[in-house]
Amino acid sequence: MHAVEEEERHEVDFLSRQVEDISDVNGSNVRIKEILSNQIVNQNDSFGKLYEITSSLDKYEPSEVLFYAAEVLAKLMDSQDVAIYTVANHSYARLFSATSPKARMLGNSIHYVQMEELYEKLREKKVFINKTMDERYPLMADAIYSEDEMQLILMVWGIPWERMTLGQANMLTVIGYLIQNAVVRANRYLSALEQQRYIHGTRILEADAFASLVNAYLNAREKKLTECALVVFEEGEISREEAAGVLSGMMRQSDYLGELSDGKMYALLANTSAEDAGMVVERFRSAGFPCRMKEEMEL
């Protein structure tokens, strides 16, 4: 009798565990169903709004478009951590805008061809998905091409694993195309005004164009989308045109020389912290160009 009771007790325990296992599986299935359902709903909702939201870039000045493209990308990917890099050549890319310290973790300049797993996908014009959660890479990335030349790299962090899907990758691709359209329009506009924007025979931006550019950077800095610094030059012994020729060779492609309404020449240092700007100022001075940081950057 005791043996029968013991056997029945074991059977009850076994069946109880089976019920618990089934409950766990059902719970997981419900969770998966919720994730997939939310993903579908969110994707449909986002696709319906994609054009409307990316079209908001058209309201900005051409020099502002890439800054706010980062905000648009963050909103549509539902992430607080996105970055946009501009490709400087066939090896390096420069950070243009980022929405958080996390999105700046790779630094102001990346040797993207050495980021092998990421570069392999981008070179194939595919979205990179960081399936191994390798901390050296963003969670997702896509490249924007123009005439088979890589122009921009979009990077996204801060998304949960359940959204690192092919559907989300397709969405990032569409967002990239729409951002590209806005950027191409802005660049065409700026190219059309090229001769009007620079002081004749120099690479010095005239006052209105330079003021617009500085304001774009200041507004983006206020929203923590970028860092920047403004350096003002004192009149030296050589002409401004000669000085601009030498200084341009000491500056990055992403930096600008220009005049403001006070008639002085300035350098706008993009994505540059105050500490780094201090080193640039010392380099300019050592080359014979007296200058200083403009502490109050309001125009």
Indicate residue ranges for each PLM-predicted region:
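Signal-transducing coiled-coil linker helices
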Residues: 45, 55-69, 202-210
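Signal-transmission linkers at sensory-effector interfaces
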Residues: 6-56, 185, 190-192
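Active-site-proximal structural segments of metal-dependent nucleotidyl cyclase/transferase enzymes
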Residues: 210-235
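Amphipathic alpha-helical "output/dimerization" segments
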Residues: 163-184, 190
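Short beta-strand-to-loop transition segments that serve as allosteric relay/switch motifs
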Residues: 153-163, 269-271
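Structured interaction and signal-relay segments at domain junctions
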Residues: 53-59, 68-124
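A short beta-strand signature within small-molecule sensing/ligand-binding domains used
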Residues: 134-143
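Conserved helix-loop-beta segment at the catalytic/binding core of cyclic-nucleotide signaling proteins
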Residues: 237, 244-276
